[in-house]
Amino acid sequence: MPTWIVSISIISFFVLSFLVQKWRHKTAKVTGGVQFDKSASFEHSFELYANPFSHCSRKVRLALEEKGIDYHYRKIDLIETGSYETLSSRYPKINPSGLVPTLVHEGRPIYESDDILGYIDSLNKSSSLIPESEAQRNEVSKWLEFCAIPSSDPMGFLE
């Protein structure tokens, strides 16, 4: 058998395998913020679906700790274990985009870490994470923007 036929067969197999996996584990775009039209099962008032290696997950955990909010941490495996839990059948029911973190507050999922930070801060204004002075608020905004990793293009900052 000619080698070009073998090569085309192997390439076709890998392309087809990739397309099948992509179809089986498809994700959907979501908008950030509280999802009033969605609900998720919950056991605790606050449940954070996150990964310890995720920058966005860590900043949400820091905000929850800083505000003194009691929450249940649900570790979602990414690439470090090879299980790719964000592409499993379970996690996309919580967040159809397959991205972490997701905060579930009494059954309502909240997507996008910066939106989660705003939500957390709005819960108790007596101990706000955002400074009162306009200059300090602007400084916080600059840092949030600098540290933002948009889910639409998480690797875009490398360009």
Where are these predicted regions, by residue range?
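GST-like domain detector, emphasizing the conserved glutathione-binding G-site
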Residues: 2-159
